[in-house]
Each structure stands twice: as structure tokens, then as C-alpha cells.
UniProtKB/Swiss-Prot annotation:
InterPro entries: MalF_N (IPR035277), MalF_N_TM (IPR048464), MalF_P2 (IPR029345), MalF_P2_sf (IPR047103), MetI-like (IPR000515), MetI-like_sf (IPR035906). The keyword Signal does not apply. Residues 36-39, 93-283, 342-369, 436-483 are periplasmic. It is found in: Cell inner membrane. SUPFAM superfamilies: MalF N-terminal region-like, MetI-like. This is Maltose/maltodextrin transport system permease protein MalF. Its main location: membrane.
Length: 514
């Protein structure tokens, strides 16, 4: 009799399709929320990934893709999606002054108002658990009083002329300040149907819209009469002269527009950006090359020493030399920042006692760069040492025995046997180390923050900045505003450079492009 394989209740098709249906509803709800809030890219990305995932995990024909999909989805979400967004931003003027859409920027300008008409002194009187608003005309001395009301939301209060103000102590400035948000939502309607709103902590006054919008999109300042027109080239409402030409005045906030290759051309044409960019690029390459050379050299020499058979206590030395690799890098960097302190650091105290010198590690460009390379060598040599220790085990002892018979010494063995045999397998790892240090943001940010700063530059730039930290400072530390578009353009250039390094790495390891 054939054994019938029983299925558990959680393996039933009805439950499976019910769960899939609930997930579809949840994803649809999230996509609608994102779309309603204007997050169109996130909505599209969520819809695509979720739809593909539901299809793969609910269709038996796509069973093999279940093992690949999580990796592909992660790459798409965390690599391709940010990359596409960064490249897209690079072709816009997106910045701290141009963050809004045109419609939103226009609405912000239309919501602005200015004081027009009489100003009335106001007082707030308690009426049980409610309040009464009293306005006083400073010119005529007339008083106007509202009915009792409670704070909460936008309200229109009808005021009537009163012979005298309510008895009792009126609210002090502290109470008014605490309820300022609620008072700003009140509109007081006087007996002549004129409306006034809170204009200061002591006054209500009539207001009018600052700008009037025409059918052609032109804004007119109701106070000065100046006309403004949207300039799609710069993303601002800009004043226009009598002859129709552009004036010098711009209205903030601006709005985001596509500006083509302008951010990229700024990198190569604006001297305030071009000079620091190329100087920082050269320093980034030099820093990466020196770091790789020094870490490999120190790591290889130490690996040879701890592998020396005549050395006693090799295990202890190995542990001690690998310790810098075990300590989190950000902790080591901050410790070195204290050690290199120009006034109280132990390194300067020692150099002063021995040689009578106190290098300016953080204010002189040359010594600051030297300090960066020293610290990065300390952080990177244990990794190279571990690699070399493993590779040394693969070198046959027969080679050293044959060289000893020929009368070769330790230095000849190192340069004629050890170094050539280690460099070849280390080459792809050295290229990977170069690419990593090309974007070593943490070291620069924690140790020097890019300083000392360069003078006469359009964008914030320092002598120890790498391209990645330079991009970060443009995006988030710009004194004249955060220029995300320019930062995205530089980030795109960095991506192309790192991509070129990846191709070099592939060619160096003789991998074929399938």
C-alpha cells in the first residue's frame, strides 16, 4: 500500500494564496502612501521589487530564481537605485536653496503676507477654562471683545465693541508665548467686517498677500510693485526690468530644475572648484598609492620576521602585531588624534624633549598629510601582514636551501625569492586596497576633517581632503549653501574613477567578462 504523504495545515494552498494576497494588499497600500507623499521613485522601486519577489516565490517555474533574487534585490536597492538617483541629481540644481518643486515654491511665496491697515493692541483674559480676546484701538481708544473660546485649530472670532475690558488679571507674556501657535490660527473679525490676525506678541493687525499671481505665472509685489517671473535656467523667481530683461533680485525659496551638464562643466571651468578638485584628486591618488606601498612593505617585513624559525615567542609577537586590526578603526583614529595634539599630545611632548621640535600636525599641510599616512599605515599593515604570513607558507623551503648553498644572504633571499613570489598573488589585493583607500572617508573625517583649509576656493576644501570627503563637505558643510547637485556630479566622477580601477583589477587578475 502506497504511503500517503500528509501535509500540515500551514502547507495548504489556500493559506499560501491568502498570505500572498495580504502581502499584495500591504504592498499596494505602501505604494499608494509613497505616491501620495510625492515619493515617486521609492513607490516605483517598491512596486517593482515586490512584484518580482511575489512572482518568483509564488511560481514554481521560477524556483531557481529564489536563491538569486535576494542578492539581486539587495544590489538593486542599495547599489543601483542610489547610483541612479545620484546621477540624476547631478544634472539638476538641487541644493539647500533649490529643494522644492516649482508648485511648492510658488505656494510658499503666495502664502507670504505683509502688515496693512490698523494695528490693535490685544489682551487675553481668562473666562473659566476658556479665554476672551480683547483688542484696543490705540488711536480712538475703542475696545473690542470676543465671546469665550477655547484654543484649538483655525477659528474666526466675531468681536463686538465693548465699553470696558473684562475684570480680572489678563494673561501675561509667558502665557501668550506658550499659546502663540494657537493664537496664530485665530482670525478676529471686527464690527466693520475687517479681519486682523496676530502680527506680534502684543498686536493684531490687518494683513494682505505680499504677492499677486497673474495668469502668465508672473508675481507682483503688492508693496513695491516689482514684478517677478520664473527663470527656468536658475530655478528662482527673478525680477524683470521695464524692458523685459532679467533684474538682479531673486526670491527664495527656489525650485529644482534640470540644468544639463552645468555641474560637470563647473568642476572643470570654475577656477574656485577646478584648482582644489585637481589638487585633491592628485593627493587622493598619492595617498592611496603611498598607503598601499607602506602597508605592504611593513606587513611583509613583519610577516617575514614572525615566521623566522630562530625567533622565540613568535606567537606573542603575532598577537601583538595583529592587535591594531582587532581594535575598531574609529577608536584608533580618535586615539591618534589625541596623541598628535600639537599642544598636549604625547608625540609632540616626546619630540620636544628629544629634538626640541613641535610639528604643527593639524595646521601645516605637509605634516598633516604625513600624519594621515602614518595613521593609515598603522591601521592597514596588520591586514597585509596576515596575508603575507599565509602566502609565505606556500613558498617551498627548497628554494631557500638552494640559495643558501649558493651563499645568498637574508636580503638576497628577500628580494630575489620572497618578494617576487609574494607580489604576484598580492597584486589584486593591493588594487582592492588602493580602491578602498581612494574613498577612505572615515579616516579624514575623524582625524583632520579635511583641514587645514585651502584659501580662495569657491567650495569648502582642505589640504588633507580626499575626493569623497571633499564631496561630503560640498553637500553638507557648504558655507554658501549645501550644493547637492555639484556634490552628486563629483560623486559621479568618483564612481567612474573607481569603476576604472575595478576594470584594472579584473584585467590584473585575468578574469574574463562573460
Amino acid at each position: 500500500m502506497d504511503a500517503v504523504k500528509k501535509k500540515h495545515w500551514w502547507q495548504s494552498p489556500q493559506l499560501t494564496w491568502s498570505v500572498i494576497g495580504l502581502l499584495c494588499l500591504l504592498v499596494g497600500y505602501l505604494v499608494v502612501l509613497m505616491y501620495a507623499q510625492g515619493e515617486y521613485l521609492f513607490a516605483i522601486m517598491t512596486l517593482i521589487l515586490s512584484s518580482v519577489g511575489l512572482y518568483i516565490f509564488s511560481n514554481r517555474k521560477a524556483y531557481a530564481w529564489r536563491y538569486v533574487y535576494p542578492g539581486l534585490a539587495g544590489m538593486g536597492l542599495f547599489v543601483l537605485f542610489p547610483l541612479i538617483c545620484t546621477i540624476a541629481i547631478a544634472f539638476t540644481n538641487y541644493s539647500s536653496t533649490n529643494q522644492l518643486t516649482f508648485e511648492r515654491a510658488q505656494q510658499v511665496l503666495m502664502d507670504r503676507s505683509f502688515q496693512a491697515g490698523k494695528a490693535y493692541n490685544f489682551s487675553l483674559y481668562p473666562a473659566g477654562d476658556e479665554w476672551q480676546l480683547a483688542l484696543t484701538d490705540g488711536e480712538s481708544g475703542k475696545n473690542y471683545l470676543s465671546e469665550a473660546f477655547k484654543f484649538g485649530g483655525e477659528q474666526k472670532l466675531a468681536l463686538k465693541e465693548a465699553d470696558a475690558l473684562p475684570q480680572g488679571e489678563r494673561a501675561n507674556l509667558r502665557v501668550i508665548t506658550q499659546n502663540r501657535a494657537a493664537l496664530n490660527q485665530l482670525t478676529a473679525v471686527l464690527p466693520d467686517e475687517s479681519k486682523v490676525i496676530m502680527s506680534s506678541l502684543r498686536q493684531f493687525s490687518g494683513t494682505q498677500p505680499l504677492y499677486a499671481l497673474a495668469n502668465d505665472g508672473t508675481l507682483t509685489n503688492n508693496q513695491s510693485g516689482v514684478k517677478y517671473r520664473p527663470n527656468a535656467d536658475i530655478g528662482f523667481y527673478q525680477s524683470i526690468n521695464a524692458d523685459g530683461s532679467w533684474g538682479n533680485e531673486k526670491l527664495s525659496p527656489g525650485y529644482t530644475v534640470t540644468i544639463g551638464w552645468d555641474n560637470f562643466t563647473r568642476v572643470f571651468q570654475d577656477e574656485g572648484i577646478q584648482k582644489p578638485f585637481f589638487a585633491i584628486f592628485v593627493w587622493t591618488v598619492v595617498f592611496s598609492v603611498l598607503t598601499v606601498i607602506l602597508t605592504v612593505a611593513v606587513g611583509m617585513v613583519l610577516a617575514c620576521l614572525v615566521q623566522w624559525e630562530a625567533l622565540k615567542g613568535k606567537a606573542i609577537y603575532r598577537v601583538l602585531l595583529i592587535l591594531p586590526y582587532a581594535v575598531p578603526s574609529f577608536i584608533s583614529i580618535l586615539i591618534f588624534k589625541g596623541l598628535f595634539n600639537q599642544s598636549f599630545g604625547e608625540i609632540n611632548m616626546m619630540l620636544s624633549a628629544l629634538f626640541g621640535i613641535k610639528p604643527a600636525w593639524f595646521s601645516d599641510p605637509t605634516t598633516a598629510r604625513t600624519m594621515i599616512i602614518i595613521v593609515n599605515t598603522w591601521l592597514g599593515y596588520p591586514y597585509m601582514m596576515i596575508l603575507c604570513m599565509g602566502l609565505l607558507k606556500a613558498i617551498p623551503d627548497d628554494l631557500y636551501e638552494a640559495s643558501a648553498m649558493d651563499g645568498a644572504g637574508p636580503f638576497q633571499n628577500f628580494f630575489k625569492i620572497t618578494l617576487p613570489l609574494l607580489i604576484k598573488p598580492l597584486t589584486p589585493l593591493m588594487i582592492a586596497s588602493f580602491a578602498f583607500n581612494f574613498n577612505n572617508f572615515v579616516l579624514i573625517q575623524l582625524l583632520t576633517n579635511g583641514g587645514p583649509d585651502r584659501l580662495g576656493t569657491t567650495t569648502p576644501a582642505g589640504y588633507t581632503d580626499l575626493l569623497v570627503s571633499y564631496t561630503y563637505r560640498i553637500a553638507f558643510e557648504g558655507g554658501g549653501g549645501q550644493d547637492f547637485g555639484l556634490a552628486a556630479a563629483i560623486a559621479t566622477l568618483i564612481f567612474l574613477l573607481v569603476g576604472a580601477l575595478a576594470i584594472v583589477n579584473l584585467k590584473a587578475t585575468r578574469m574574463k567578462f562573460d
